[in-house]
């Protein structure tokens, strides 16, 4: 029985005969005195035995028993009510110390890895927003095996090292991130967390990794390190059905450009920092493509050029305004209506009609067909390689939304799969088709341009009952979208669940769903809630609903809820129910940079050089490297207030008297040290 590690203390003795000369003895004895650890029936502790996830849950909940509940428990299918650790697992989940695996499994008997034990502790204690990740650039100096740290866990390694929580025996230069944590390891980690909390005194040990021994890049003389306000502030711009842009098909190029500039000017005025523009609504293209025809939503005729490249134009105009550009693709939809427009080659309905099915009035590509999988990959990678996009974005359309009494017509390819020896059920096969596509895209994008972000905005309900009380469409079974798996496998950089429901809508409650999405985020990706300004009607949906929803998103920042994306731009343009006024006066009063992604890049750019001040004008020059923009801060008491975000081409600013700092921002939104100047 391995359950002797924690929960209650059955002996008043704090000594175990097999730890007398063990490196972890002081940590073990200290925790035993607190009633956190106990030994086996034979009196031994067995410090080098590995720890299971169930045992770890028991230790954590005993040690940090005062941490408040942060989310509702969703019972795991492999943790029965009568299991010895069910209560501990439930509490560890509710307090965000630990999460599960895809398909609602917990795997209680799996051994917990050292890095995941550390990740669990900092998640439950909310350390991600309290401890600096400044050691990220020097992890390779600290740990000889830094290359073995999974990308998702690098911030964990930096935070726990900075907090003095990492203890490594016999060699503190090895983190051994993926090794199973031993009882001794866990004892040391937990004790060091108590030291960080101020609840225990430090124990001298040569195996504690001392962060002060390593050089972190320091700001140059006359400079200052500033932690900027960060929040993802995005808006969707839909082209399908003439939703947001252009206002109608067939407009002259100049008018199309003017309309898009009007949208971007409004977003800039409201201090948004990201645009998600639909560039492939139905197997077509709002850009020059050798793979697919020009979209009829642009010109009224599929295949007809609008006379310019809207994608290239949109990217350029966004970057002038310090707005990130994310290209939005619909992967499988071939036509919103087979009657609406004549498809022309190279539309897939013309080149490969055998893999395009009529479903209701729509045309839909078969996600299981290799020609479709290759087409999607080639189309998206073509954009990644040829255009200066900041992100690639997929929405909620995978397999089509179901039509009553109408099955998706892929019985023949599924039968062929089974005849070839495939064993997956139809539902699992369909989900696997989508998974293959997403994983391939994730790898391809990172290989081609590692700075390009990959995000998905799935339907806001994963499955009814997850979490408890939630009702609605089962995206897992109806759309074959296993968004929980994508997030937990780390196949994306951000997820933007479409939470188009009110806070008081019990069966689809906004805060309940958002907390659930943040709770399953074991790879520590970013969560940007999708909000609907399109629903504002002054009746069931009033302006204050959006205000409260943004507040809820911000309250979950420690759980990596780091922004919002609004559907859609037309509602913002119209100032529907006064929401635009509210953005300006309350929600987005101050500028903010987009959030950084430590698993992609953490290297700060060079600071600006030749910074001078004269006649209320500050001028500067680039210090080298690729710069996306500049930030200008003004000092107020002991705080630095972000005054302006300027495009890279602008290297001067006229200001009022005061003390300022100018910083460089790279394309991943990493910020340099600020160069201080006084006027």
Q: Residue locations for each model-derived region?
A:
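Feature responds to low-complexity, polar/acidic, surface-exposed segments characteristic
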Residues: 3-25, 33, 38-54, 60-88, ...
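Active-site-adjacent "subsite" loops/lids of carbohydrate-active enzymes
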Residues: 227-232, 238-258, 327, 332-386
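Catalytic domains of carbohydrate-active enzymes, especially glycoside hydrolases
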Residues: 258-284, 386-390
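Aromatic-lined carbohydrate-binding/catalytic grooves of carbohydrate-active enzymes
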Residues: 270-306
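Polysaccharide-binding and catalytic clefts of secreted carbohydrate-active enzymes
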Residues: 280, 321, 351-461, 465-491, ...
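Substrate-binding cleft of secreted/luminal carbohydrate-active enzymes
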Residues: 480-506, 518-600
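Conserved aromatic anchor
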Residues: 615-626
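Beta-strand-rich modules
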Residues: 653-671
């Amino acid at each position: 029985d391995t359950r002797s590690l924690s929960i209650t203390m059955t002996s008043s003795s704090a000594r175990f005969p097999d730890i007398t000369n063990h490196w972890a003895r002081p940590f073990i004895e200290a925790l035993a005195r607190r009633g956190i650890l106990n030994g086996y029936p034979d009196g031994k502790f067995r410090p080098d035995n590995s720890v299971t996830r169930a045992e770890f849950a028991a230790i954590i909940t005993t040690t940090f028993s005062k941490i408040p509940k942060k989310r509702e428990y969703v019972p795991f299918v492999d943790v029965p009510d009568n299991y010895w650790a069910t209560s501990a697992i439930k509490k560890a989940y509710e307090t965000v110390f630990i999460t599960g695996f895809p398909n609602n499994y917990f795997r209680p008997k799996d051994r917990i890895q050292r890095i995941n034990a550390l990740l669990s502790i900092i998640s439950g204690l909310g350390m991600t927003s309290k401890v600096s990740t400044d050691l990220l650039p020097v992890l390779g100096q600290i740990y000889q095996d830094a290359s073995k740290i999974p990308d998702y866990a690098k911030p964990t390694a930096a935070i726990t090292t900075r907090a003095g929580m990492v203890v490594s025996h016999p060699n503190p230069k090895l983190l051994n991130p993926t090794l199973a944590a031993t009882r001794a390891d866990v004892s040391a980690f937990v004790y060091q967390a108590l030291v960080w909390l101020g609840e225990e005194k430090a124990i001298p040990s040569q195996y504690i990794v001392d962060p002060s021994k390593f050089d972190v890049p320091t700001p140059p003389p006359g400079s200052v390190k500033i932690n900027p306000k960060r929040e993802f502030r995005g808006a969707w711009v839909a082209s399908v059905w003439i939703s947001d842009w252009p206002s109608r098909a067939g407009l002259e190029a100049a008018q199309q450009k003017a309309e898009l500039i009007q949208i971007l000017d409004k977003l800039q005025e409201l201090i948004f920092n990201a645009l998600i523009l639909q560039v492939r609504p139905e197997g077509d293209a709002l850009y020059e493509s050798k793979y697919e025809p020009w979209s009829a939503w642009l010109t009224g005729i599929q295949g007809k050029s609008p006379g310019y490249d809207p994608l290239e134009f949109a990217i350029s105009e966004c970057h002038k305004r310090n707005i990130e550009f994310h290209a939005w693709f619909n992967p499988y939809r071939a036509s919103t209506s087979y009657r609406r427009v004549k498809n022309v080659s190279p539309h897939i309905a013309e080149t490969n009609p055998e893999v395009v099915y009529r479903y209701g009035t729509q045309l839909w590509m078969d996600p299981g067909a290799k020609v479709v999988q290759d087409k999607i990959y080639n189309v998206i990678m073509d954009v990644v390689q040829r255009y200066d996009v900041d992100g690639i974005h997929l929405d909620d359309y995978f397999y089509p939304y179901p039509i009553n009494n109408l099955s998706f017509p892929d019985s023949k390819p599924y039968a062929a799969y089974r005849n070839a020896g495939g064993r997956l059920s139809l539902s699992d096969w369909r989900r696997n088709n989508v998974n293959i596509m997403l994983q391939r895209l994730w790898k391809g994008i990172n290989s081609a341009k590692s700075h390009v972000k990959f995000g998905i905005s799935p339907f806001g309900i994963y499955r009814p009952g997850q979490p408890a009380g939630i009702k609605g469409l089962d995206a897992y079974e109806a759309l074959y979208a296993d968004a929980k798996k994508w997030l937990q496998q780390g196949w994306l950089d951000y997820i933007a669940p479409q939470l188009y429901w009110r806070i008081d809508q019990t069966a689809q409650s906004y805060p309940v769903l958002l907390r659930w999405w943040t709770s399953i985020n074991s790879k520590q990706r970013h969560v940007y809630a999708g909000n609907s300004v399109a629903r504002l009607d002054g009746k069931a949906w009033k302006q204050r609903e959006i205000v409260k929803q943004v507040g809820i998103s911000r309250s979950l920042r420690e759980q990596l809820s780091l922004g919002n994306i609004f559907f859609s731009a037309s509602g913002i343009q119209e100032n529907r129910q006064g929401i635009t006024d509210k953005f300006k006066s309350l929600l987005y009063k101050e500028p903010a940079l987009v959030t950084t992604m430590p698993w992609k890049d953490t290297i700060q750019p060079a600071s600006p050089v030749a910074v001078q001040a004269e006649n209320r004008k500050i001028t500067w020059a680039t210090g080298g490297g690729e710069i996306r923009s500049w930030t200008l801060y003004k000092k107020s008491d002991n705080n630095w207030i972000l005054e302006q975000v300027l495009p890279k081409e602008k290297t001067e600013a006229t200001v009022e008297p005061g003390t300022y700092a100018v910083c460089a921002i790279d394309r991943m939104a990493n910020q340099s040290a600020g160069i201080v100047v006084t006027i």
